[in-house]
Amino acid sequence: MKILKKIFQVIVKIINHCVPVDSRSLYFIPHPNCRTDKYDIINYSSDNVLVLLNYLLKKDSAEYYKIYVEIYDSSRISEYQEYIYGINPNIRCTFLCACVGRFFFNKVSFKDMLYAFFCFCRASKCFTATFYYDFSFKKRSQQIICLGYYTPFKDDYHMGDHSYDKFRNTTCNSFDYSIATSCLSARIISIDCGISYDKFKVLGFPRNDLLIPKNNCNVIKREISKFAGYDVTKYIVYTPTFRDYETVTEGNLRSILGYVDCDLLKLSKILLKFNAALILKLHPLQNKTVLKKDLPKGILVFEQTYKYGLYDLLSFSDGMITDYTSTYFDFLLVNKPVIFNFYDIEEYRRVRGFSFEPIEFFCAGDIVYNYNELIDAVMGLLAGKDIHAEHRRHISLLMNQFQDDNSTKRICDIFLNEI
């Protein structure tokens, strides 16, 4: 199998080098998690590639380009075409199956894979949301730009075995540039993924430009109130990361907040007192079989929808509860309170680890280790208690070099200067 894969890679490289590059052709690959999160060219605000693409589409100069976009739901192509036509009927945009850079990880027809590959061969620039791709077959006239999807929090360097070193070498040869939110972030990600530090550009994440409240917020709020069954006026979003070490054994089912034995009705009463809702956005890779399913009023599980995504919720949220997810660093830009739910921190530190130690120094908010502390922190947040504003500002300046909403523009000024 390894020999066949090697032969295939050589053939791919030869073919790519034989196909001339069109300087006006661009290739976009959204994050693979868009498949489960239902993010796409219409519901785009939570993915860096999709935000950049929409920024381009809404410029008059979009007609200058030939645009190729990988998609994860082919049944929505007609909706995508209608969406593009509504923006500008003269835009040339082709939708492709998601496969380039991951030929051995996608179940697509050979015909679709071949067509997507030849479209890639023509592209002068390719924008991805993650570095888990092999573009070592690219030619020098092509630029591969990783727009990024995280700011370091968890330890990603030690999460793989020795074969991960080979992956880092491949990654270094695959990408020409990688976008980060700060110099500190760039240095750590460089170590994690193998892309050399000199290839990083600190420009900020496009999705963070949209953390300001948007016109559709009232529509989303009405949907939340309808689902909750009462008029919700305050919102807390819970964004836990996944635990790859969790398995189901008899009696170990935990609540969705992490605790095995806790009275969620107690939290429910507090939420209802303040007309608040706790909206749980689970990680796409979370093992849901370890979670108890019954939830009282006021505690809602975000169900993936093509209408809106996580960053739409964050844009009007009154606060966040999180654990070890890097979404926290993005949320710092709106300067709202954060609660850190560290119910399993010692196990997580042992199994996965962190990018920084002591991690608590970077946590600008209440840190809780048990359910009663979580209850108190939520009550304080809803009552308007906020003693961590200055700490948030310091950490945000450390992890977000730019505190504005111009990241997408900065990226376009460098890589798409025809706009």
What are these regions (language model features)?
Residues 95-98, 109-123, 279, 284-329:
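Donor nucleotide-activated moiety binding/catalytic core segment of transferases
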Residues 6-43, 241:
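Nucleotide-activated donor-dependent transferases that construct or modify glycoconjugates
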Residues 1-5, 9, 13, 216, ...:
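C-terminal amphipathic helix plus adjacent low-complexity
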